[in-house]
Amino acid sequence: YTLLVCAETMGTYRTMNICDLGYDDFTVISPLVGDPKVLVVGKDSKYNTLQELLDAIKENPGKITMSHSGPGGSGHNQGLVLKELGYEVAMTSFDSGNDALLGVIGGQVDFTNPNISTLGGYIESGDVKPLAVFSDKRMDAYPDIPAFTETVPEAEKYLNIPYTLLSFVVNNDTPQEVVDVLKAASEKVFADPEWTEFVKQNAADPVYDEYKDDASIQAFYDNWKSVICWLQYDNGVAEKSPEEFGIKRIGE
């Protein structure tokens, strides 16, 4: 049997008109981990807090620059969230997330929002200043970095989901007895202290702890699509309406 560890972007393939695949084409063994996004500026930036940066964006609409790795990606989605919240930034696309980060370190752009898995070393070296976790909660590994919603509470409806999520899935044709074995094996791994320490050391968000049964897993993915697919469509990024695929807006 072929197993797949997939990224969250599969939930947008249809609305982005990339291909006719979605979460419902697969059986989810478990969400794995989220890789939290952190809003950072360069070490020499004049901005020392999220509020200072947001004030500058308000005072200079469309002038403060934000780098990302391309339309439809998690970093770009966060730029769309800022837009929805009334913060107009100049979004600049780079070839990769790492290039987007180096653009900030090199002073080419004002800020970006990389994953913590690629950012930790730059925080430790002092090359960047982390202003906020792009989430509604702080990270255990970096408890001094405030959550974005501590400064902008109204962002909570967009930030109660992981923006970079890995999931463990199999084809829908996989026999149920095989799915059951894989789920049991996954639960055994998740309970292993070695795995728990690995997740902690990498500052990952243990999403698997929150969603264990099929109903909660389905609700999780439905909510993710409601947030992201409509966010992209309303901002002209997605080609097709989420309504075509039965994706409801938040709160519907």
Predicted regions and their residues:
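C-terminal lobe and pocket-closing loops
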Residues: G120-F190, E239-E244, K248-E252
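Short, Asp-centered acidic motifs that coordinate Mg2+ and/or phosphate
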Residues: T2-L4, V38, D110-F111, P130
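Ligand-binding pocket segment of bilobal, Venus flytrap-like solute-binding proteins
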Residues: K63, S67-I145
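Hinge/capping helix and adjacent helix->loop/strand transition within the periplasmic-binding protein
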Residues: Y1-T2, R14-D99, F148, L165-F198
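Mobile beta-alpha loop/short-helix "lid" or hinge segments that flank ligand
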Residues: I29-S30, E154-P162, T196-V207
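Short secondary-structure boundary segments
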Residues: E8, K43, I116-S117, S135, ...
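Short beta-strand segments
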Residues: L4-A7, K240
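An extracytoplasmic/periplasmic, membrane-proximal ligand-sensing/linker region
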Residues: E124, E177-E252
